[in-house]
Design a protein with these regions (language model features):
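Active-site palm subdomain of RNA-directed nucleic acid polymerases
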Residues: 56-97, 104-106, 115-124, 203-214, ...
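C-terminal reverse transcriptase regions that engage the nucleic-acid substrate
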Residues: 121-248, 383, 391-393
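Structured nucleic-acid-interacting core domains from mobile-element enzymes and related host factors
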Residues: 1-5, 238-264, 330
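Metal/cofactor- and membrane transport-associated sequence elements
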Residues: 1-117
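RNase H-like nuclease module associated with reverse transcription
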Residues: 131, 221, 258-259, 294-423
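Reverse-transcriptase-like RNA-dependent polymerase core
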Residues: 13-38, 56, 80-81, 160-177, ...
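Mobile genetic element proteins and their domesticated derivatives, centered on retroelements
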Residues: 11, 27, 46, 58, ...
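RNase H-like nuclease fold core
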Residues: 200, 262-304
């Protein structure tokens, strides 16, 4: 979106059959064939080695074509020859080519077609269940999962349900709601709780940061859920029914803007076990590209400590993201700004030694101070009402939740940046 690059989708037919096997493996021959047993020379779907051998074959192919594997993500390869820039991202047999020109895209496709049997999908419109919509004249790209979401609603009989405006119910999910007896467990055993949570988890990972907190709460009870937990899962589906056309909208940003904007936040001891919830958001091209809602591993003794741990959690993702973008050719000369709404935390990241209330924190959390000193990141204060990571730390009221949907550019319809639909 930032550079108006070409997006092209390729599919490798019977990908696993391309990988030669290193182990000696035999199979029973089909009936009617003379030899009773066959030795496998290449992989088959279902073999434990098949996926690994396919990756090694693909890696050798890219290496022979002068591509470089990104150490930050081994599924991404880059190739810069002359003025042509090619980035290839692979998930099993799906390949997404990102190039700076159609000529470079055609060259990369032809080179891969000489090695494998490939279906050329043209301009990328679908990838791993995500719909990609582009308005190239306006430098706008939208990613959504509306069709996948509709299938989820149909599967669980919620396609025409009454909708809700927030993903979380009014009640908090507690262990007291878990079944107390074998009869209670048998009553809820047939409920599709795990299936709902698993499918919603994929949504929250790909395109829907607004449901990350709700999914995380539901996932805590996957092995021991009760009726109220299931009601909360259906509440989430009712919210998704209302917002099913929403997706992340990216657009070109002014050159004066930094490539990344990051936000970290935390509640404080609001959960049942008094462990706080960390949330972070990393934005690029105006919308989130990475986010997380995660319960902290220890009980924070103050809100400052809880926010400090949240910032440390975010810092690790920032460092990885900067490294990945650098390997893809988008180097960041300036430190990435991390916004936090706790002034004490901001002060601690710049001078941790002068704060006695932080001396007991485990050493891993002080990694953020090292990154500040190395100028990889720079932590700044932001008012809590302007911190979108708040969405990932606790249930919010309708008005505040809707505000963050707009702020994160989770838009409905055709993805018009200027006219956002607010639930």
């Amino acid at each position: 979106t930032l550079n108006d690059y070409e997006l092209r989708q390729l599919d490798v037919k019977t990908a696993y059959l391309n990988g030669p096997l290193e182990e000696e493996i035999y199979m029973v021959a089909p009936p009617g064939v003379g030899a009773p047993y066959w030795r496998l020379r290449k992989g088959l779907y279902g073999l434990r080695q098949a996926g690994r051998q396919w990756y090694l074959t693909l890696h050798e192919t890219y290496s022979s074509l002068k591509y470089t594997c990104c150490e930050s993500d081994w599924s991404i390869y880059t190739c810069n020859i002359g003025d042509d820039v090619t980035i290839s991202a692979t998930s099993v047999d799906d390949i997404l080519l990102v190039t700076n020109s159609k000529t470079a895209s055609d060259i990369a496709t032809d080179e891969l077609r000489k090695k494998f049997t490939i279906t050329d999908g043209g301009d990328a419109q679908w990838l791993l269940g995500c719909r990609i919509s582009r308005w190239r004249n306006n430098r706008i790209l939208k990613i959504d999962q509306e069709f996948f979401l509709v299938r989820i609603l149909r599967e669980f009989g919620m396609e025409f349900c009454n909708s809700t405006v927030t993903p979380c119910p009014k009640w908090r999910l507690m262990t007291d709601m878990c079944p107390k007896s074998d009869d209670d467990r048998r009553t809820v055993a047939s409920l599709p709780y795990c299936a709902i949570v698993g499918k919603c988890m994929y949504l929250s990972t790909c395109t829907r940061p607004d449901i990350s907190y709700a999914v995380r709460e539901l996932a805590r009870f996957m092995s021991n859920y009760g009726q109220q937990h299931f009601d909360a899962a259906k509440h989430l589906l009712r919210y998704l029914q209302r917002t099913r056309s929403r997706g992340l909208v990216y657009s070109r940003i002014p050159n004066t803007f930094p490539m990344f904007r990051t936000f970290a936040d935390s509640d404080w001891a609001m959960s049942e076990g008094r462990r706080s919830v960390s949330g972070y958001i990393i934005e690029c091209a105006g919308a989130p590209i990475a986010w997380s809602s995660k319960q902290q591993g220890i009980v924070a003794l103050s809100s400052c400590e809880a926010e400090y741990l949240a910032c440390a959690h975010c810092t690790r993702q920032i460092v990885w993201t900067r490294s990945l973008f650098r390997e893809m050719g988008f180097n960041q000369a300036n430190p990435t700004t991390l916004f936090c709404d706790n002034k004490g935390t901001v002060s601690c990241t710049h001078d941790p030694h002068s704060h006695s209330q932080m001396k007991h924190i485990d050493i891993w959390a002080h990694y953020i101070c090292d990154c500040v000193n190395k100028r990889s990141i720079d932590v700044h204060h932001i008012p809590g009402v302007d911190n979108p990571a708040d969405l990932l730390t606790k249930p919010l009221a309708k008005v505040i939740h809707s505000k963050w949907l707009t702020r994160l550019r989770l838009y409905a319809g055709q993805g018009g940046v200027s006219s956002a639909e607010v639930a």
